[in-house]
UniProtKB/Swiss-Prot annotation:
Species of provenance: Aquifex aeolicus (strain VF5)
Family under the similarity heading: Belongs to the dethiobiotin synthetase family.
GO cellular component labels: cytosol
Residues annotated for substrate binding in this entry: T40
UniProt GO BP: biotin biosynthetic process
Active site location: K36
Protein name: ATP-dependent dethiobiotin synthetase BioD
Record's keyword annotation contains Transport: no
Length: 220
């Protein structure tokens, strides 16, 4: 399984979902690895990469091969920081991990149209690396438009979206009651609902359901 976990926006919980999915798969005995090709806003140690390493046991260096200090899209970070990286080297690293792990979860930065390099987005990367797509979006007001546009763009660029995760259900936002139904009607994909929690680790039943949801929708 080779999967791009992308978001409808920044801060929607991609790393949180990737961590819990990876942890559950590993606990089931699968050989699972994570890859965050580029992490920005890194001060000393990559925060997202460090969390993912706790789920899989990988080194942070293996998970995050490219890092920038500014909180920007990868391409913007290359412009602001005056340094670059080679897509070819990223591709080689991906191929190495693909051979090493049965399940490889690739976490994007921001959304699927975020540029990694000039004229090269995460949608391009998913196409070139032959990744299927899992979308993570917010549970509340505004998520219908954001989720539909992400799904539509992915489909328009020839990608296969296998699932939609709506993250952060509180029970307080009235839109949460109808958002999943409407998104399913618009995309044909039944979203998986994840509650808002204070901890980084989902309750076991929710985590199990998350992994079952993804595995049931994935056809090699």
């Amino acid at each position: 399984m080779r999967l791009l976990i992308t978001g409808t926006d920044t801060g929607v919980g991609k790393t949180f979902i990737t961590y819990n999915l990876a942890k559950e798969l590993k606990e089931r005995g699968y050989k699972v690895g994570c890859l965050k090709p580029v992490e920005t806003y890194v001060r000393e140690v990559p925060e997202d990469g460090s969390l993912l390493s706790k789920a899989t046991g990988q080194s942070v260096n293996e998970i995050v091969p490219v890092r920038f200090s500014l909180p920007l899209a990868p391409y913007a970070a290359t412009l602001e920081e005056g340094r670059d990286f080679a897509l070819e080297e990223l591709g080689k690293h991906y191929e190495e991990l693909s051979k090493k792990y049965k399940f490889l979860l690739v976490e994007g930065a921001g959304g699927i149209a975020v540029p990694i390099k000039k004229n090269y987005t995460y949608a391009n990367l998913a196409r070139d690396w032959k990744l299927k797509v899992l979308i993570v979006g917010r549970a509340g007001l505004g998520t219908i438009n954001h989720t539909f546009l992400t799904w539509y763009y992915a489909k328009a660029t020839g990608l296969e979206v296998i699932g939609i995760i709506l993250n952060g259900f509180t029970g307080e936002d009235v839109s949460e009651r109808t958002n999943p139904q409407i998104i399913e009607e618009m995309t044909g994909i039944k979203p998986y609902k994840v509650p808002r929690i204070q901890d980084v680790e989902l309750p076991k039943d929710i985590r199990t359901g998350l992994a079952d949801y993804v595995l049931s929708r994935f056809t090699p």
